[in-house]
Amino acid sequence: MTATDDCVFCRIVNGTLPASRLVETDTALAFLDIDPVTPGHALVIPKEHLPDLADLTDDLAGELLAIARRIADALRRSDLRCEGVNLFYADGEAAFQEVFHAHLHVFPRYDGDGFTINANWGTDPDRADLDDIATMVVDALGSE
């Protein structure tokens, strides 16, 4: 896919919008989010306009994660001294994706930062239900 004029991330890649760049390779770019959840909140994107997670090659997905890991390490070692990191990838409207250009969030975490992830982690599903879901996913993986 090619860059689109209405994609904010494509405009950052091509230099028509400013960004505080952190890491750049031939195929990926990382920069600070202009509306950060916490200080140091970064985004890691492919330079090519790829809207969805499924559009990424395995190599490119690995590169994005490797860059995110490097940034997480740097955030801990920097004067920001973050105490932890969350990686977050929203894929699709139901997952609250707002910019339809693949991107991985790197959220530095600090004690008392107020950022929360609200979910019902204690659903305690039935083993048979888990096995049924696993079968559906394995079948779909086999049809790739």
Regions found by a protein language model. Name each.
Residues 1-144:
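HIT superfamily nucleotide-processing domains
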